[in-house]
Amino acid sequence: MAGFFSLDGGGGGGGGGGNNQEDHRSNTNPPPPVSEAWLWYRNPNVNANANTNVNANAPSSSNAALGTLELWQNHNQQEIMFQHQQHQQRLDLYSSAAGLGVGPSNHNQFDISGETSTAGAGRAAAMMMIRSGGSGGGSGGVSCQDCGNQAKKDCSHMRCRTCCKSRGFECSTHVRSTWVPAAKRRERQQQLATVQPQTQLPRGESVPKRHRENLPATSSSLVCTRIPSHSGLEVGNFPAEVSSSAVFRCVRVSSVEDGEEEFAYQTAVSIGGHIFKGILYDLGPGSSGGGGYNVVAAGESSSGGGGAQQLNLITAGSVTVATASSSTPNLGGIGSSSAAAATYIDPAALYPTPINTFMAGTQFFPNPRS
């Protein structure tokens, strides 16, 4: 054990020095005062074969000499105890570093006896101090002894995983490693992204807009009118040709350009449960002889055929309409076509003047019911 041994001829030895029977030669000169007394301090943690006989006349510079014995000056009791505690902490640090294998693999460099040079021992002690201070201070990780890389935190051999496995040390810390290369991590993340659907949107990204439904264009002659999908105007619900009875009403219409009034006929028919309204305009004398009128239906293509159609048109009163074979039926009078030309009746005499007139190209509005 470590202890203090007085050099002034006294017997006192501190710190457990009484248990060690040490023989030393003291100086024959008169002892110095108590305040200037010198003490030997024995280091038990170094080479036991070191020489313990030291000349008492050694100069005071031997304070810093490294060996089995160190020279201490007895200033006061408190300073001695403080220096003793610091030295003991230093020794504990050296011993723990040597036990863990910190520093060079050659343990002979830790022998700080008189045979080893002072510079080499200082470098070894400095290396132990640096490595032990780095591991205990918490400022950084412990370096591996072999390669110098960062060692595993819980590794008792103070080595990294590669060096610990290459040397064959039985270290439980390096049995299983959780480290995964960056390339494998990226590959696994890409696989997970493709397999698992994205459940939530990242922060800052807006909700994606719903795609606009492109409705198929339907063939219809109705302008500015949206036909619902269940209206019944789909292909196949209406026949290509229709023969039905209708009542035509004579009205007066005028053009926007010249303002001259003319006669026209308006009607409404029901085809397939739907109402079709139109106006028949006067286009001049027909080419099939007689004085009949050549009329066309304004919405003839709305019946779905778009081609020639047969319309059975019946007028009010005694005026009858013959069935036509083309899209421009001929309006006749009573009897044959020649008789109809002779007994032509003015439509104004049959129908009163309407309250409102209709212009070409305008929408038809029926008269209000009384």
UniProtKB/Swiss-Prot annotation:
It is found in: Nucleus. Residues 8-19 have a biased composition (Gly residues). Residues 1-37 are annotated as: Disordered. Keywords: Activator, Auxin biosynthesis, Auxin signaling pathway, Developmental protein, DNA-binding, Metal-binding, Nucleus, Zinc. Induction: Regulated by ESR1 and ESR2. Zn(2+) 2 binds at residues 144, 160, 164, 171. Zn(2+) 1 binds at residues 144, 147, 155, 160. Residues 144-171 bind DNA. It comes from the Eukaryota. Signal peptide: none annotated. Disruption phenotype: Gynoecia with aberrant style morphology. The double mutant sty1-1 and sty2-1 has a reduction in the amount of stylar and stigmatic tissues and decreased proliferation of stylar xylem, as well as shorter siliques and rosette and cauline leaves with a higher degree of serration. Hypersensitive to 1-N-naphthylphtalamic acid (NPA), but restored by exogenous application of auxin. GO terms for molecular function: DNA binding; DNA-binding transcription factor activity; metal ion binding; protein heterodimerization activity. Disulfide bonds: none annotated. The keyword Zinc-finger does not apply. A motif (Required for homo- and heterodimerization) lies at residues 271-274. One of its GO terms (biological process) is pollen development. Belongs to the SHI protein family. Forms homodimers and heterodimers with LRP1. Transcription activator that binds DNA on 5'-ACTCTAC-3' and promotes auxin homeostasis-regulating gene expression (e.g. YUC genes), as well as genes affecting stamen development, cell expansion and timing of flowering. Synergistically with other SHI-related proteins, regulates gynoecium, stamen and leaf development in a dose-dependent manner, controlling apical-basal patterning. Promotes style and stigma formation, and influences vascular development during gynoecium development. May also have a role in the formation and/or maintenance of the shoot apical meristem (SAM). This is Protein SHI RELATED SEQUENCE 1. It comes from Arabidopsis thaliana.
